[in-house]
């Protein structure tokens, strides 16, 4: 599982700038789970072979008693609880403050691995200028400048060092390709637990309620109609009764990690609430992760015809990037519409792992070009020669030719539609990559 790093510090020390630096390798795909005045932001990052999740928080005042600062303090405590390691950010130019001491006291009591870093340190020399930060009792301080990109690699190295991470290639155990790893994702109270209770039965659900840390992968194997599945915990799977905040607060990270570990994600929406920002963020994360996806609208029986029509239009606009996914209207509590969902899950998994031969891909490509040529860009018109498969789950198609950097996104979508139709690809994203051949004449002219 990906390690989780929380950025903590008082307001305006540059946490968000550090967050953007640490997540830039994955285009800073941010899951901004709305609902509070200042909530936690989640993003993906990568350093060498190691990937991680970063949580950005609001300014932290541990003893805040009311208003926005109380909410921000609550969010920061939850971020720290979710994290494997904390990066405590202070301001190198402003120096140490009473708030810094309060935060340090809070972190020391937790005993969680913590890296102390002084941001805005550009142009400052190490030594006496940073000695005051030793008062915080958190060891050495690492000077960085997020705005200039200085010290970021050292910062992540220090953060990940206490976790003793194995090489991802060595850590990964071979998975049985016949088993579908399924994650049920969705915001709180959309009916995840009700749906899974219906699938597995109450006795099986108990096995999810195990003690463990954020990085524990909890899953339950089961079989349906001869197909083996492994259901990955997304932190909505708990016994009936009171759901304590200490449990609920892990839901976001576990959802992101479950999506990463799944073959297929069932994204559950609430018909009575419509498509929320949080739904759209989770859907975007699924797409960015390249996972096959099935949409299910729960509580369909609880809305009238007008609400249904409004919801369908909302899905068409707000989740347009998932138009390749099957959509099902269900009622988990009444067990209505569930059987077709299984068929779509199996179909999405098969589509994500479909093998496509080079001769067929090339034929489809040339037929598509003959029917509609790519748009000319100045003196250049892209020339496409052949295509082959570059990967599965999700399917990747690599197209070779000349001047392919001028191919528009609209034309790529046109090609994607042709490939999808031929290979019956439903429920999986597709990646199309363009590779232009070496042109010695162009190189010669530019020399």
Swiss-Prot record:
Ligand binding (GTP 1): 9-16, 56-60, 119-122
Domain KH-like: 354-438
InterPro entries: G_ENGA, GTP-bd, GTPase_Der, KH_dom-like, KH_dom-like_a/b, P-loop_NTPase, Small_GTP-bd
Molecular functions (GO terms): GTP binding; ribosome binding
Domain EngA-type G residue range list: 3-167, 180-353
Record-linked Pfam families: KH_dom-like, MMR_HSR1
Gene3D superfamilies xref list: 3.30.300.20, P-loop containing nucleotide triphosphate hydrolases
Coiled-coil ranges (or none): none
GO BP, sorted A to Z: ribosome biogenesis
Residues that hold GTP 2 according to the record: 186-193, 233-237, 298-301
Record key words, sorted: GTP-binding, Nucleotide-binding, Repeat, Ribosome biogenesis
PANTHER family according to UniProt: GTPASE DER
Record note on quaternary structure: Associates with the 50S ribosomal subunit.
Family, per entry: Belongs to the TRAFAC class TrmE-Era-EngA-EngB-Septin-like GTPase superfamily. EngA (Der) GTPase family.
NCBIfam families documented for this protein: GTPase_EngA (TIGR03594), small_GTP (TIGR00231)
Purpose of the protein: GTPase that plays an essential role in the late steps of ribosome biogenesis.
Record's protein name: GTPase Der
Biological source species: Polaromonas sp. (strain JS666 / ATCC BAA-500)
């Amino acid at each position: 599982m990906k390690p989780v790093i929380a950025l903590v510090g008082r307001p305006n020390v540059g946490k968000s700038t550090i967050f953007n630096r640490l997540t830039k390798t994955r285009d800073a795909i941010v899951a901004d789970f709305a609902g509070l005045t200042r909530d936690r932001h989640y993003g993906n990052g990568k350093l060498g072979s190691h990937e991680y999740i970063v949580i950005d928080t609001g300014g932290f005042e541990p003893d805040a008693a009311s208003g926005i600062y109380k909410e921000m303090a609550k969010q920061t405590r939850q971020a720290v609880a979710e994290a494997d390691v904390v990066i405590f950010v202070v301001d190198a130019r402003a120096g140490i403050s009473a708030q810094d001491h309060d935060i340090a006291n809070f972190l020391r009591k937790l005993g969680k691995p913590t890296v102390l870093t002084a941001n805005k340190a550009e142009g400052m020399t190490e030594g006496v200028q940073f000695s005051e930060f030793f008062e915080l009792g958190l060891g050495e301080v690492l000077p960085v400048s997020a705005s200039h990109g200085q010290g970021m690699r050292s910062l992540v190295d220090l953060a990940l060092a206490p976790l003793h991470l194995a090489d991802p290639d060595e850590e990964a155990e071979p998975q049985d390709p016949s088993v579908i790893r399924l994650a049920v994702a969705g915001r709180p109270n959309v009916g995840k637990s009700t749906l899974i209770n219906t699938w597995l039965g109450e006795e099986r659900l108990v096995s999810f309620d195990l003690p463990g840390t954020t990085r524990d992968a909890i899953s339950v194997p089961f079989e349906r109609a001869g197909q083996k599945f492994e259901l990955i915990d997304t932190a909505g799977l708990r016994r009936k009764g009171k759901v304590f905040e200490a449990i609920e607060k892990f839901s976001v990270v576990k959802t992101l990690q479950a999506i990463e570990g799944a073959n297929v994600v069932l994204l559950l929406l609430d018909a009575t609430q419509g498509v929320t920002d949080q739904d759209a963020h989770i859907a975007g994360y699924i797409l960015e992760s390249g996972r096959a996806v099935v949409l299910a609208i729960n509580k369909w029986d609880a809305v009238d015809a007008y609400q249904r029509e409004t919801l369908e239009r909302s899905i068409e606009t707000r989740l347009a990037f998932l138009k390749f996914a099957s959509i099902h209207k269900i009622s988990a509590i009444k067990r209505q519409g569930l059987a077709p969902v299984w068929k779509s899950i199996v179909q999405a998994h098969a589509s994500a792992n479909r093998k496509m031969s080079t001769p067929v891909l090339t034929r489809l490509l040339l037929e598509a070009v003959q029917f509609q040529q790519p748009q000319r860009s100045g003196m250049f018109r892209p020339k496409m020669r052949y295509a082959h498969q570059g990967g599965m789950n999700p399917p990747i198609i690599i197209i070779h030719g000349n001047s392919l950097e001028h191919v528009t996104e609209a034309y790529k979508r046109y090609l994607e539609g042709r490939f999808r139709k031929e290979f019956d690809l439903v429920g999986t994203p597709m990646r199309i990559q363009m590779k232009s051949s070496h042109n010695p004449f162009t190189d010669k002219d530019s020399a």
